[in-house]
Regions:
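Basic, Lys/Arg-rich alpha-helical nucleic-acid-recognition elements, primarily the DNA-binding modules
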Residues: 1-87
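ATP/nucleoside-binding phosphotransfer catalytic cores, i.e., glycine-rich phosphate-binding loops
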Residues: 9-17, 32, 52, 76-77, ...
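Gly/Ser/Thr-rich loops at beta-strand to alpha-helix junctions
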Residues: 47-48, 146-157, 180-181, 244-247, ...
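HTH-adjacent hinge/linker in prokaryotic transcriptional regulators
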Residues: 60-142, 159, 165-166, 184
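Ligand-binding beta-strand-loop-alpha-helix segment within the catalytic cores
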Residues: 99-109, 168-245
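Short Gly/Thr/Asp-enriched flexible loops that form oxyanion-binding sites at enzyme active sites
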Residues: 153-165, 251-259
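Gly/Ser/Thr-rich active-site loops/lids in small-molecule metabolic enzymes
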Residues: 253-282
Length: 348
């Protein structure tokens, strides 16, 4: 396939340019549907006049439908879109970027989706879909315990989970941490419940505050029910989690002014599992949390991290300096460009 693409680039470059343009239109309609022509033109940076001709072509081919509510992708259009993904990623340089990024971060694998989730929110949905596929490939055992962390990215991951995900496997989804006091929709408990309900699988809850004072923390750790819940979480053979911006996460957790001053003074840029990392990957602060600890990751065979957007690049880089080598990172062009080039330039 790559040889054919190289030949086409030399002999028929215009054909490939048209194919890329129509793929981008189809992709944008799929993630924003139903979407109007004016909105789509703005998303793509294309004039309505030029877009009108392309949309009419896609409709004539049966790839999209046009209604008063907006444009949507047909079943045939979705098949074409999925079939084109690999080719388009190769043409855009994404495959090469993925390999370079994995080498830079010294982890098992990187997968980069087109776009920047800071600018285009539906890019996060695409990252979620890719993460679901990676989890599906990882769960080769008959019985699996999957730990899922909280956060808005993980909530999107849950939304992209297909109803037939179990495929005959016995799956138990467990929250990687407690979450009382956090936004309900983004709590790990809630996300596990949504995934289990959607896929017809099982889940457990960990109804304890995400963070407590040291005395209360040590007291609760002695409770048999808490210990049993933590043992179950620690037995996970796969985990899916995000990476947070340090200050954003601290404020979201209603952290004291004293601690915020500390992590600011010590230049924390990233956060995961209650650990705050500086740009060198050093832990500059840790909060006592109920659930998986960073050191527990060494025992988990399959680790999938989902984080994207230009604004997350420093957080991703800081965390990956300590991440296990078997980590798979699902990110977007926005973060990948900053990590590889230190700029927003397009990946090449």
């Amino acid at each position: 396939m790559s040889d054919l693409i190289n030949i086409q680039q030399k002999l028929l470059p215009d054909v490939l340019a048209v194919m890329q343009k129509r793929y981008q239109i189809l992709r944008s309609i799929y993630f924003a549907e139903p979407v109007g022509r004016r909105t789509l033109a703005g998303m793509l940076g294309m004039s309505e006049r030029v877009l009108r001709g392309e949309v009419e072509f896609l409709k004539a081919q049966g790839l999209i439908d046009i209604a008063s509510s907006g444009m949507t992708v047909t079943k045939e259009g979705l098949i074409v879109f999925r079939d084109l993904e690999g080719i388009m990623n190769q043409l855009s340089g994404l495959h090469s970027a993925e390999n370079r990024l994995a080498e830079l971060l010294q982890i098992k694998k990187c997968l980069v989706v087109q776009g920047d989730s800071d600018i285009t929110p539906w890019v996060r949905e695409e990252m979620g879909r890719v993460a679901v596929k990676q989890l599906d490939l990882a769960l080769v055992e008959k019985r699996n315990v999957v730990a899922v962390m909280g956060g808005s990215t993980m909530a999107t991951f849950a939304d992209t989970m297909p109803s037939d995900f179990a495929k005959g496997r016995e799956l138990l989804f467990v929250p990687g941490r407690g979450g009382i006091g956090e936004d309900l929709d983004n709590q790990a408990n809630t996300i596990c419940d949504r995934i289990a309900t959607k896929t017809g699988t099982k889940h457990r809850v960990l109804y304890v505050p995400e963070q407590l004072g040291e005395e209360a923390y040590q007291s609760l750790m002695k409770e048999p029910a808490i210990q049993e819940g933590l043992r179950l979480v620690q037995s996970a053979n796969a985990i899916v989690h995000g990476i947070g911006d340090a200050l954003t996460m601290a404020k979201r957790r209603h952290t004291s002014d004293e601690v915020i001053e500390k992590i600011t003074r010590l230049s924390a840029v990233g956060e995961a599992f209650g650990y705050y990392f500086n740009e060198q990957g050093e832990v500059v602060h840790k909060v006592s949390t109920f659930g998986l600890q960073f050191e527990d990751l060494a025992k988990i065979p399959h680790i999938i991290v989902v984080a994207g957007g230009t604004s997350k690049a420093k957080a991703i880089k800081s965390y990956m300096k300590s991440a296990p080598e078997n980590t798979i990172l699902v990110t977007d062009e926005g973060a990948a460009n900053m990590l590889l080039n230190g700029s927003k330039a397009h990946l090449k």
